[in-house]
């Protein structure tokens, strides 16, 4: 969510939220547009209910059409569905090989498999029951994105972020509504990540919300280990910024969140192993995944990913660059920053590091860019 609203935010937990000079200039430059934005941002909470209803209709209205056949169930989904079905029907967490129990192999991580298994338990085994899980996580991710953007930038910017994701064309195979129809890790990951940031906004002097933040990020870490370097960059980078400004209370909270998220993920993994003891076979190691997916230096792939990001999707890097300029422009204005400004910095670093990795190091699969694009909206 890189574009900041010119509407000053209410102070949070004793921090002073102040508009800056750029906001005043923007407001004076376009009074007609400003009045529309002001009316929207000051509207009653009924507008939020309308947005939530629209998202529900948009996600499920489009998602339930040909849910079993479009797109066809494919390799990545098949592993997860196989493990969830075998777990529900036979009690074995894995697949079958020639009728004998086998490891889960390339299935999605436990939170995704467990969600699909819960759907199978409630509604029976089938393709629509599988993909219903993806739709629920997709709706959750959109609602949390709206809630987060509304708190950080105002209602008008939150609605604009949703419009960008839903209406501005990406490659169709990675459109959130298309990915959300499938049993993949991206939408659950985004749901848990965004829930963590929403909880962090409420965590100042509130230990329960701090614990909720840690729990959400631990689930995100467990859902897709790919997020680890970017989440660490988001938190650690913000700690550096806050330490340079001498805001040590924020540095301490971020340190607790980062260490707690890692520890929480380890605890969840131990809990999973305890739960599945006697129902799972050892997972064979998969060598070479880092070189195949995460660190690729083939020139043709690098040119393709750079073209994707800066030619096909230029609004996202441009928006992040503008957000970085705004953050830099206000860095020395006050001794302490509000919790909103802290989260803005964290999201900027998270989305920026993710998209930089996609452009300059990834294997080039467009789906790898989706979390970064979603967060950059």
Regions found by a protein language model. Give the residues of each.
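Transmembrane-lumen/periplasm boundary regions of multi-pass, lipid-linked membrane glycan transferases
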Residues: 86, 232, 238-339
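Aromatic- and kink-enriched transmembrane "portal" helix at the membrane-lumen/periplasm boundary
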Residues: 67, 127, 131, 141, ...
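Hydrophobic/aromatic-rich transmembrane helices and adjacent perimembrane loops
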Residues: 135, 186, 229, 345, ...
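Transmembrane-helix signature of polytopic, membrane-embedded enzymes
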Residues: 52-55, 145-172, 190-191, 204-212
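Membrane-interface alpha helices of multi-pass inner-membrane proteins
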Residues: 199, 209-225, 236, 354-355, ...
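Transmembrane-helix motifs of polytopic, lipid-linked glycan transferases
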Residues: 53, 57-60, 132-153, 195
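Extracytosolic helix-loop segments that constitute the early lumenal/periplasmic catalytic or substrate-binding loops
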Residues: 61-66, 78-114, 118
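Membrane-interface transmembrane helices that cradle and orient dolichyl/undecaprenyl
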Residues: 18-20, 156, 193-211, 220, ...
């Amino acid at each position: 969510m890189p574009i900041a609203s010119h509407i000053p935010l209410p102070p949070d937990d004793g921090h002073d939220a102040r508009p800056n000079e750029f906001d005043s200039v923007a407001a004076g430059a376009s009074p007609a547009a400003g009045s529309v934005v002001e009316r929207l941002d000051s509207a009653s909470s009924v507008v939020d209910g309308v947005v939530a209803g629209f998202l529900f209709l948009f996600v499920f209205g489009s998602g339930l059409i040909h849910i079993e056949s479009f797109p066809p169930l494919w390799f990545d989904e098949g592993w997860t569905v196989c493990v969830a079905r075998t777990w529900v029907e036979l009690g074995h967490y894995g697949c079958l090989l020639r009728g004998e129990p086998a490891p889960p192999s390339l299935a999605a991580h436990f939170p995704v498999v467990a969600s699909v298994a819960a759907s199978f338990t409630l509604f029976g085994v089938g393709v629509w029951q599988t993909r219903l899980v993806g739709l629920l996580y997709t709706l959750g991710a959109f609602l949390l994105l709206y809630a987060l953007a509304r708190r950080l930038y105002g209602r008008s910017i939150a609605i604009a972020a949703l419009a960008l994701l839903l209406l501005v064309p990406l490659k169709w195979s990675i459109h959130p509504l298309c990915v959300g129809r499938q049993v993949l890790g991206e939408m659950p990951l985004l749901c848990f990540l965004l829930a963590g940031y929403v909880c962090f906004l409420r965590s100042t002097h509130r230990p329960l919300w701090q614990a909720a933040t840690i729990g959400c990020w631990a689930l995100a870490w467990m859902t897709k280990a790919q997020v680890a370097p970017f989440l660490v960059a988001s938190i650690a980078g913000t700690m550096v910024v806050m330490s340079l400004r001498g805001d040590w209370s924020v540095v301490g909270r971020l340190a607790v969140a980062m260490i707690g998220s890692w520890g929480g993920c380890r605890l969840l993994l131990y809990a999973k192993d305890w739960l599945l003891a006697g129902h799972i076979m050892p997972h064979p190691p998969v060598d070479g995944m880092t070189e195949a997916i995460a660190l690729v230096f083939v020139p043709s792939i690098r040119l393709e990913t750079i073209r994707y990001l800066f030619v096909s999707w230029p609004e996202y890097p441009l928006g992040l660059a503008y957000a970085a300029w705004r953050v830099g422009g206000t860095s020395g204005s006050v001794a302490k920053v509000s919790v909103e400004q802290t989260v803005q910095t964290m999201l900027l670093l998270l989305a920026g590091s993710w998209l930089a990795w996609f452009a300059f190091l990834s294997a080039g699969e467009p789906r790898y860019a989706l979390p970064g694009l979603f967060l950059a909206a």
